[in-house]
């Protein structure tokens, strides 16, 4: 475990201006702000005014923009504050390596891999919201966390739920885990209807408030596909132990089934601050003004099997897990390229999964990753191959 004064935790937030990052700071302030947390570093990308405001408000020691061209703008925005400023990939690594016992890894995409890995190697306790660390880097990242000696605390609501109900002394008795999925905005849509949806329609999630890309990933169920791969690495599971069930109310966040037939579930209103608060204050629980479940008003919980004909991302995740090696990075890289093309209106909604499958077919013989350079190389090949299919 990372060292530090438990009465005031030193925290770095990678990706503080995004959806997870802003909610993390909301939780930090609700838990006492600067009286309970020391903010070692905050990082963002293009939203310089918000990053500067966050850094000043929280008394951060260091503020970093991932965009090297915005360094001067950030420095000017923080003039006279005494807050250090850095930019680019080296700045992100500097933030991750700064002495802080706790780190929120909320940078979206491969840009978060390097700095999160750096934090793992130095032994930080990591609240993990970046999917690529596990989907693309998998065993390499888990190995780095183990060698560093820190803890890995999942922030995804589904994995956080499993983490909460998984009995460490009973891991040998785990039979399966069941990831719940809302089904997204197209749960009841036909294939023909799904052919004509736009990014604006796909971003409208029925239960959760999220950013554009993750909302569309939820609509296509690629988000759930990535969570399946993450769960395999986080909880050391076989692919056949991971199930997905559609649960439209998003009240049960995930379940663990044991060999005696028992199933333990974590329930709560759909609010990402619950998982964030749990990860930031672990092993203690914190007081948060989250809406409480009223079971009398809830009345019912619904479940249905996912339709993999309409949502083939789940099938592709199983294929990637069974193949092992570098296929998680291939799936993710191809998905990211297809997602960008869909957002720009260059391909249809259903074409995203079709492109990912074709890329996996073409790159099925890539060797397993030995280093992070192998991961980045596979990701680049997948993106280039997908781009070629889109043209």
Swiss-Prot record:
Its EC number is 1.1.1.267. It comes from the Bacteria. One of its GO terms (molecular function) is 1-deoxy-D-xylulose-5-phosphate reductoisomerase activity. Its cofactor is Mg(2+); Mn(2+). One of its GO terms (biological process) is isopentenyl diphosphate biosynthetic process, methylerythritol 4-phosphate pathway involved in terpenoid biosynthetic process. Belongs to the DXR family. This is 1-deoxy-D-xylulose 5-phosphate reductoisomerase. It comes from Sinorhizobium fredii (strain NBRC 101917 / NGR234).
């Amino acid at each position: 475990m990372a060292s530090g004064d438990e009465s005031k935790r030193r925290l770095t937030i990678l990706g503080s201006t995004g959806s997870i990052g802003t909610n993390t700071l909301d939780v930090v302030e609700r838990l006492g702000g600067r009286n309970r947390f020391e903010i070692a570093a905050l990082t963002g990308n293009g939203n310089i005014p918000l990053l500067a405001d966050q850094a000043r408000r929280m008394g951060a020691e260091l503020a970093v923009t991932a965009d090297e061209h915005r360094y001067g703008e950030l420095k000017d925005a923080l003039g006279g504050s005494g807050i250090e400023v850095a930019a680019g990939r080296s700045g992100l690594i500097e933030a991750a390596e700064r002495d802080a016992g706790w780190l929120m890894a909320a940078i979206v995409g491969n840009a978060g891999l390097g700095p999160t890995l750096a934090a793992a190697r130095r032994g930080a306790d990591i609240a993990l919201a970046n999917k690529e660390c596990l989907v693309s880097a998998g065993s390499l990242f888990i190995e780095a966390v183990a060698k560093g000696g820190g803890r890995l605390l999942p922030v995804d609501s589904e994995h956080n739920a499993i983490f909460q109900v998984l009995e460490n002394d009973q891991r040998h008795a785990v039979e399966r885990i069941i990831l719940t999925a809302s089904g997204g905005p197209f749960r009841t849509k036909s294939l023909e209807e799904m052919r004509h949806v736009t990014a604006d329609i796909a971003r409208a999630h029925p239960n959760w408030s999220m950013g554009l890309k993750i909302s569309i990933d939820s609509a296509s169920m690629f988000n759930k596909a990535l969570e399946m791969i993450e769960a395999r690495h986080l909880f050391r599971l076989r692919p056949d132990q991971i199930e997905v069930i559609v649960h439209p109310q998003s009240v049960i966040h995930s379940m663990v089934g044991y060999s005696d037939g028992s199933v333990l579930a974590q329930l709560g209103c759909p609010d990402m601050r619950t998982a964030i608060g749990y990860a930031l204050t672990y092993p203690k629980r914190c007081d948060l003004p989250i809406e409480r479940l009223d079971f009398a008003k809830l009345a019912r919980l619904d479940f249905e099997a996912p339709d993999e004909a309409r949502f083939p991302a789940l099938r592709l995740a199983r294929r990637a897990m069974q193949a092992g090696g570098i296929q998680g990075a291939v799936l993710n890289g191809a998905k990211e390229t297809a997602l960008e093309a869909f957002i720009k209106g260059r391909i249809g909604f259903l074409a995203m999964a079709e492109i990912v499958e074709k890329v996996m077919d073409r790159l099925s013989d890539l060797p397993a990753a030995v280093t992070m350079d192998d991961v980045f190389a596979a990701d680049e090949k997948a993106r280039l191959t997908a781009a070629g299919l889109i043209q």
